[in-house]
Amino acid sequence: MTPAGETHHVRDAMSTEILMIGPRHTLRHAAKLMSQRHVGSAVVHNPETAGIGIITERDILHALGHGLDPDDEPVETHLTHNVVFATPHWTLDQAAEAMTRGGFRHLVVLEDDQVVGMISVRDIVRAWSRLPSAA
């Protein structure tokens, strides 16, 4: 349960400014776009397969740590394919639980099979910190 026993939903905390990139973008290009937008992840959409994945700053750092060239490495070889999706109607507790269970820090938010947002651990903590304290 959220602090003070209040229930807030993913729609209350998610970002609706979503960075969407293609699978053939290089890691450097993805990192540059993420930096410019001040986001820690991007939704990777492959129009050929209608598939969706996610690339995070952690994925990029992992590749660089293994000595891979960010100018040559395509995003598609480093993204997460088995994306766990949230809905705007999930509670923040449900989102946090899914993140904990899956070991990740971002969830793509879908509504009617459309990407409508992204929620991160930071978004959840920020929303919880704004709740009034329990007396």
Language-model region placement:
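Tandem CBS (Cystathionine beta-synthase) repeat/Bateman regulatory domains
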Residues: 1-135
